Amino acid sequence: MDDRFAALRDATASALLRGPGATSVELRQLIARGEPPPDLSSLVEQIRSHAYTVTNEDVDALRARYTEEQLFEIIVAAAFGAAQERLSAARRVLEGA
């Protein structure tokens, strides 16, 4: 199946998961895989499964440990990882049809 957006996704993944940032590359990769450290597990799981339910209070609870830039990267890595997994699952179904 042709994937005309693969190069764009790869560039996004490279910048997000392997580029410089306020958080470590390792942390962003763990989060994208759905394997965050314990202090982030609740937020990351919520983003990956029910992002629409995340509230300011959920994020505020982490502000004592993480900067605004770090929280942004954490949230984006969680959303990107979930999106990648869903896209991969959908492509497998379509290719099997």
Annotate each language-model stretch with its function.
Residues 1-97:
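Hydrophobic alpha-helical segments
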